[in-house]
Curated annotation (Swiss-Prot):
Residues 947-962 have a biased composition (Acidic residues). InterPro entries: SMP_LBD. It is a multi-pass membrane protein. This is Testis-expressed protein 2. Residues 133-187 have a biased composition (Low complexity). Its main location: endoplasmic reticulum. The SMP-LTD domain is a barrel-like domain that can bind various types of glycerophospholipids in its interior and mediate their transfer between two adjacent bilayers.
Length: 1127
């Protein structure tokens, strides 16, 4: 192939960027001719137009031409050149004005002509017409097919002569890839003439002229399109029609190596076509750009529909769509009426690099929507953004291909029926669609869960059993076989009559029963059967065979002389009925604390006792209900006969050495053991053991009682065949010969059968009590959700807590979790409304707090703490989340996520009485504190059976250092006393030593010092404490029966925001170190009471404990020795 200008390729690199092209369409009054003004964007293009001006004039008829501005539109082109994967032969060479998206159109020759005039506008003005339909088998760019009615002029010379219509070529528009061998001006005259068309009569008004002109264009387009599919050779269409062919534009993605705007598809049907080709000069580029400008000018009033179709056709821009589709859609709308012929259709074909093509069907009903037949994989990304807009429009077409579209359907559409969509709209629609899909999936979840086999609770199981009874398949089969044999076999008449009578009688009986039986009778039997099976299902709770832990022991207990420093630490192991007490070489802390380290001790001795027939009770005898589980009062164990047991223990010791507990090392206790055994053989041996926390004390007491009844229950069960174990204060248990304590709840069998098989008790109340205790695990099994779930349901449980749960599994929204506890928070909030607002309750709380404050031990020169101000805030604690309850050997556990933001505020006041300095501290201590043997404690016994507050739970009387002799206790603010050999703390001894010196006494006698001491003594010390926030996991525990306590404490130290503002008189102390120290100490005191293993307790009136006088087995009705025999 040749070109007119050989150095065109070199010029293109130096050419300036084309300016924004403009279009001016002029039409004569006679409407026979149309004048379109265009020019190149540079000087070279103007010279080129002057060169061909003479050919324009020759081709014009004598018809008059009237210049009229028809339309104008600015378009800013964005030329983009991609990488050419095909090689250098297809490298992109762009000329000025060449950044267009269409190829030259094949237009028929018409009798009328159109005159092209030079426009004075310097901007590039390009003519655009409806382009040619893409060849189905060609790639997206390549040489353009020419016909006798198509011509073009070229400005580029190239050595390449072979056509580039092969599908393997890169889809890039180059100057050499779209040229022909024609270099004369005659073909260009045919192109100019083909722009002419026959129009309707001139008398039609201006809007009508638009519609008639477009109608003719649409008709000629549809007719010629159908012919073009069957005829691949050049032809001369009728002069009365303007034959237009559609072709695909903007379908190439920008990553295919070509410009999405400048890469038209080749219309060649075969690379072996020998017809003449034409070159692509800059003039052709201007013409192509002008064609597109004209199409956009025409469809501007209907730009919304064009954007929708263009986006559907695979463009990356909302406005980018093929000129053929956009022009035709707007032309159809301009017609203003429905086309009666449904044969008119438009076809927009997609031709990818593999040459995939789509056919068209001209017989499409107007009501049918286009359907997609395929979708290339390279446009998957576009599909997601286009799918939502297509669904909203009711179109089910491919994101790349508008395969079939009825012309009449497009014409019937009004412009208000279409909405303006942009790229961001598609994203929003996609999100909205996903939400709709999620909402549509919600009703399906219950069905899916039901099909997957949800584990139903007892009521659901009963309903399912009633609604879905099992079919008696075998019975029905046998009955059908009998009927078949009866009808087939030649039976005698009397046999047939017998069978017939039996059958009729059976059916009559069934009908009578069905009519006269109440409808709920069958359902009742089903419910009874299911409930019976449900009741016998018990919890699988296994108690540890060995209960071990630290306790405090005292040899002799006297409430009037007792002090915590008189106790020593022991490690206790309870295995069956055997109790082992291991004494360490040094004491550990007398009270448990959160996250305490493992003590490093060595055991120096060990005592072994048999608790069989022992008497277990609490001392003092008359403990107030609120002090039953106070750790300051011990558990008393009056041991039974120990002679046989100790001889057996010695034999076991000789055969196998006794290992020390896990917390210690090997203990050298073998030599003194015979002496200890002799001592323990005495019947009057009594042990006093203190729990380190109140909750541990209750647990130890319950287990001691069970161990004391272990052997007696074995004897009873072995002596009486089928006999039942005696009453236990907790739950039923069966014993093993080894003496290990085994819980009956560990068996999967229920206790209902055992109750039915037991002989009747003499006392009805006792049997009722027995049955209640036996059914404890069964009763709790109905109250606590089952641990086991079906495999289909188990992932759902983990979805609430695990972030890695599968997305397809239904998840509980956070709002639902909050709603589950909303009713509890609302109920508590309403109940405590008056509690927060009424003065009666604030005074009651103030009194309770004051009773606690009065028991705090302060230095002897300080007055008592008083509560001067209390503000309980405006809110009560809220439950943020309630975890699933569970039951273990310690009872029922419920974990609650709590939060408090109520601004609880209280102000404490005290004074320092410096006049007491230098006086005998023992005398002052006798008035306030509890000191030990030397001092008499007349109130100690009185406090035991009263509801008056005892010493603070956070008091330091039990907080001494882990020394062998129980050394000096740690000093805490406001907690001074005599401990560890009845010695005061080091600081107090140092202060006493200074104040008793003669120099200090002389100094205090001076008037100035006396005056200052009086001023300081009269100055109040104020401390305002505000609890702003408290948040943590609160554990609520209810021990197994019999108990009347509910224990609560935080699993770990909660997040507490305390603000302490100390004042010295009217002056507020603002030292950061002082306030931080006070806040830290307050948090430590809070942990000593409310952080596990320390738990606070409240007693519930409706619950009964072993010490409850209302109980049939109350231990307080009789003296302690006899009370131990009662369960």
């Amino acid at each position: 192939m040749t070109s007119l200008y050989g150095r065109h390729a070199e010029k293109t690199t130096d050419m300036p960027k084309p300016s924004a092209p403009k279009v001016h369409v002029q039409r004569s009054v006679s409407r026979d001719t149309i004048a379109i003004h265009f020019s190149a964007s540079g000087e070279e293009e103007e010279e080129e137009e002057e060169e061909f001006r003479e050919y324009f004039e020759e081709g014009l008829d004598d018809q008059s031409i009237v210049t009229g501005l028809e339309a104008k539109e600015d378009l800013y082109l964005e030329p983009q050149v991609g990488h050419d994967p095909a090689g250098p032969a297809a490298s992109p060479v762009l000329a000025d004005g060449l950044s267009v998206s269409q190829a030259p159109a094949i237009l028929p020759v018409s009798k009328n002509t159109v005159k092209l005039l030079e426009s004075p506008v310097p901007a590039a003005q390009v003519l655009s017409t409806v382009p040619l339909a893409v060849s189905p088998g060609s790639s997206s760019s390549g040489p353009l097919a020419s016909s006798p009615s198509v011509s073009s002029l070229s400005e580029q010379k190239t050595s390449s002569s072979s056509p580039l219509s092969s599908p393997s070529k890169s889809p890039i528009l180059s100057s050499s890839a779209s040229t022909s061998t024609l270099s004369s001006a005659k073909p260009f005259m045919s192109l100019v003439k083909s722009l002419s068309t026959e129009v309707e009569p001139k008398e039609s008004p201006h809007p009508a002229r638009h519609r008639h002109l477009m109608k003719t264009l649409v008709k000629s387009l549809s007719t010629d399109t159908s012919r073009q599919e069957s005829d691949t050779v050049s032809y001369k269409p009728p002069d009365s029609k303007l034959n237009l062919h559609l072709f695909k534009q903007f379908t190439q993605p920008r990553n295919t190596g070509g410009d999405s705007k400048t890469a038209p598809s080749s219309p060649l049907t075969s690379p072996s076509d020998t017809r003449s080709f034409f070159k692509v000069p800059e003039m052709e580029a201007k013409i192509e750009d002008t064609k597109r400008r004209l199409s956009e000018v025409i469809y501007e009033p209907f730009q919304l529909l064009s954007k929708i179709i263009g986006e559907e056709s695979g463009s990356h821009r909302p406005k980018a769509l093929s000129s053929s589709a956009s022009e035709l859609s707007n032309l159809s709308s301009l017609n203003g009426h429905l086309e009666s012929n449904n044969n008119y259709s438009i076809k927009e074909e997609e031709c990818d690099s593999e040459g995939d093509g789509y056919g068209s069907d001209s017989n499409i009903p107007r009501s049918d929507h286009p359907k997609s037949t395929g979708e290339p994989t390279r446009e998957i990304e576009l599909k997601s953004s286009q799918g939502s807009s297509l669904k909203d429009l009711g179109l089910k077409t491919s994101s790349l291909v508008l395969e079939k579209c009825s012309l009449s359907a497009l014409v019937s559409k009004e412009d208000e029926e279409f909405c303006e969509l942009y790229t961001e709209d598609f994203d929003l629609e996609t999100e909205g669609e996903s939400k709709v899909d999620k909402l549509s999936d919600i009703p399906l979840k219950p069905e899916v869960l039901a099909e997957d086999g949800v584990v139903l609770d007892s009521e659901d199981e009963v309903d399912s059993a009633v609604q879905h009874p099992e079919l008696p398949v075998k019975t029905l089969g046998f009955f059908i076989m009998c009927v078949y044999v009866y009808l087939i076999l030649p039976l005698p008449h009397y046999v047939s009559g017998l069978f017939l009578g039996i059958g009729l009688g059976f059916m009559t009986a069934v009908c009578v029963i069905w009519f006269f039986t109440p409808p709920s009778a069958h359902k009742y039997h089903k419910l009874h059967k299911n409930l019976r099976h449900w009741n016998t299902r018990s919890l699988d709770i296994k108690e540890p065979e060995i209960l071990k832990g630290w306790m405090n022991e005292i040899y002799n207990y006297d409430p009037e002389t007792y002090h915590a420093t008189l106790t020593h630490s022991v490690f206790v192991r309870l295995e069956g009925g055997t109790l082992r007490l291991s004494k360490p070489n040094k004491n550990i802390s007398r009270r448990a604390s959160y996250n305490e380290p493992k003590p490093e001790v060595t055991y120096i001795s060990q005592k072994i006792y048999d608790l069989s027939d022992s008497k277990i009770y609490l001392v003092p005898k008359t403990l107030a209900r609120k002090r039953i589980w106070n750790k300051k009062y011990p558990i008393c164990i009056e041991l039974g006969q120990q002679d046989d047991f100790m001889s057996k223990a010695q034999t076991d010791k000789e055969t196998s050495e006794e290992k020390p507990p896990a917390e210690g090392s090997e203990d050298p206790k073998k030599p003194p053991r015979p002496q200890e055994g002799t001592r323990s053989s005495q019947r009057d041996q009594i042990l006093y053991l203190f729990g380190r926390t109140g909750r541990e004390k209750e647990e130890w007491f319950r287990r001691f009682i069970l161990a004391s009844k272990l052997k007696s229950e074995i004897k009873k069960s072995s002596g009486v065949s089928g006999g039942k174990p005696g009453l236990l204060p907790a739950h039923s248990r069966h014993n093993s010969p080894s003496g290990h304590l085994t819980h009956s709840r560990s068996s999967s069998k229920g206790s209902v059968e055992e109750i039915m098989s037991q002989p009747k008790q003499k006392e009805l109340a006792g049997s009722v009590r027995q049955k209640m205790l036996l059914d404890y695990s069964v009763y709790m099994g109905r109250c606590v959700p089952q641990e086991s779930r079906s495999p289909q349901r188990s992932p759902l449980q983990s979805a609430e807590s695990s972030p890695t749960a599968g997305k397809k599994l239904p998840e509980v929204p956070p709002s639902e979790e909050e709603e589950q506890e909303a009713w509890v928070n609302a109920l508590l909030g309403r109940i405590f409304w008056d509690f927060l607002g009424e003065k009666y309750w604030s005074d009651l709380v103030s009194k309770k707090i004051q009773m606690k404050l009065s028991k705090i031990k302060l230095p002897y020169f300080m007055n008592e703490l008083t509560l001067t101000e209390l503000d309980m805030g405006v809110a009560v604690p809220k439950i943020l989340q309630a975890f699933k309850p569970y039951v273990d050997h310690q009872g029922l556990w419920i974990d609650l996520e709590m939060s408090y933001n109520g601004s609880f505020l209280m102000t404490l006041e005290t004074k320092m009485n410096l006049t007491k300095l230098g006086k005998e501290p023992l005398v002052e201590a006798l008035k306030v504190g509890e000191i030990g043997k030397e001092g008499c404690r007349p109130r100690a016994f009185c406090l035991a059976d009263s509801d008056e507050e005892s010493s603070s739970a956070g008091s330091s009387e039990e907080d001494d250092a882990p020394e062998p002799s129980g050394g000096d206790k740690q000093l805490l603010p406001g907690a001074e006393g005599y401990v560890g050999g009845h010695r005061t703390s080091k600081i107090m001894r140092f202060v006493d030593k200074i104040t008793k010196s003669k120099y200090f006494q002389k100094a205090t006698e001076t008037e100035f010092i006396k005056k200052k001491i009086e001023e300081v003594s009269n100055t109040p010390l104020l401390l305002t404490v505000e609890v702003q926030e408290c948040r943590g996991t609160l554990a609520v525990n209810i021990p197994p029966p019999p108990t009347d306590r509910v224990w609560y404490g935080f699993r770990k130290p909660p997040h507490v925001e305390l603000k302490a503002r100390p004042k010295l008189g009217e002056r507020e102390v603002t030292l950061v170190h002082v306030t931080d120290w006070i806040e830290k100490k307050l948090e430590q005191e809070f942990q000593k009471v409310f952080v596990m293993p320390n738990m606070d307790d409240v007693y519930i009136t409706i619950m009964h404990s072993a010490m409850d006088p209302r109980s049939t087995s109350c231990l307080l009705k009789d003296p302690p020795v006899e009370a131990a025999d009662q369960p």
